[in-house]
Amino acid sequence: MKTVLITGCSSGYGLETARYFHSQGWNVVATMRTPSEDVLPRSERLRVVALDVTQPDNIAAALEASGPIDVLVNNAGIGLLGAFEATPMAMAREVFETNTFGVMAMTQAVLPQFRARRSGVVVNVTSSVTLAPMPLVAVYTASKTAIQGFTGSLAHELEAFNVRVKLVEPGYGPNTRFTQNSGKRIEGLIPEAYAPFAQRIFTAFAQSAAVTKESDVAHAVWRAANDSSGQLHFPAGADAMALARPNS
């Protein structure tokens, strides 16, 4: 029976992905900064483990508690919405610590066991902002685009060890806590000069018919984790699929 470790499982895409892998008979290690047992079914095949991907000691402890794993899903991430001109560099660094360096740190930590076994899959969850540039998310886009390039390079680097590396690219999920938290972080990041432009962007998002559901992402992660071909990109959600089509 295979084991998957998924970061960022307290809500949204990570939570649904943990539920889906469990429903498919896998052992699941669901990690979150503040563990909450009641969001997932009670099962001998499911463990909730505390993990902050920005803390090296946390990563080491979580992997020791998890034991050997077959798949790592780097899902944990934070959003940031606002004009770049008004974004403090400290806030930009905070986004990169989780979205970029946290993914790299988790991946680096599991590679020794994958390489030794000559088996394993890393699935990095990025965003459809890497498929088409969007305004007011410059820092967030940069943090995810870095992982896009990192994943592509690493896929070639680890091929000789039979370790696969994949990208899942979700679209806009308006109902996720991730999106709600991004909105909370906007305070002070839309200067008056940007307000009319920002309002048009927010209105367009609110009227978007094609969006991404949590189940879209869970299924895409499942496909990526079980894919034995050389496919790298797995867009998730109707909007992401539409954006990816011109690039396919």
What are the roles of these predicted feature ranges?
Residues 10, 14, 18:
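N-terminal Rossmann NAD(P)H-binding glycine-rich loop of SDR-like oxidoreductase domains
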Residues 83-84, 91-93:
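Substrate-binding pocket helix/loop in short-chain dehydrogenase/reductase
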